[in-house]
């Protein structure tokens, strides 16, 4: 069923998690994903281009993200109107990310419970 599919595909690696998180609000192109992941992870995850594009290729193949065309809206005339590839989460990708976030919440809640001594 759907549950076994989810189990096989989570937990996500940190790189995959942050890439998907980066795409959860709006489509982004490769370089913007790299910068965003670095900032979101507070420098824990610094992606090389090779790692990023390998991950994007895999995510496209899994159907978790898709390519969209983004028209550059730039004040620089040369750039303006040029199309570049951006990536966005699919509805399946959103579902996977949501499940992973819930999984992480459970892990953190357990730690909080144990370390604050709040358990019965």
Question: Which stretches of residues belong to each language-model region?
Answer:
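Beta-hairpin "wing" of winged helix-turn-helix
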Residues: 60-80, 88
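Basic amphipathic alpha-helical segments that dock to polyanions
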Residues: 52-59
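Amphipathic alpha-helical dimerization/coiled-coil segments
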Residues: 1-4, 92-120
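Exposed loop/turn and edge beta-strand positions of beta-sandwich/beta-sheet ligand-binding modules
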Residues: 83
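Short, contiguous hydrophobic alpha-helices characteristic of membrane insertion segments
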Residues: 7-9, 63-64, 118-120
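N-terminal helix-turn-helix DNA-binding core of bacterial DNA-binding proteins
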Residues: 8-51, 70-71
């Amino acid at each position: 069923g759907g549950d076994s599919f989810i189990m096989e595909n989570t937990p996500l690696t940190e790189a995959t998690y942050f890439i998907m998180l980066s795409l959860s609000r709006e489509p982004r192109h490769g370089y913007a994903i790299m910068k965003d992941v670095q900032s979101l992870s507070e420098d824990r995850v610094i992606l090389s281009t090779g790692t990023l594009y390998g991950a994007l290729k895999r995510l496209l193949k899994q159907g978790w993200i898709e390519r969209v065309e983004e028209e550059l809206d730039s004040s620089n005339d040369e750039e303006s109107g040029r199309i570049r590839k951006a990536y966005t989460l699919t509805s399946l990708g959103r579902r996977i990310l949501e499940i992973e976030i819930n999984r992480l919440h459970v892990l953190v809640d357990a730690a909080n419970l144990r370390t604050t001594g709040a358990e019965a």
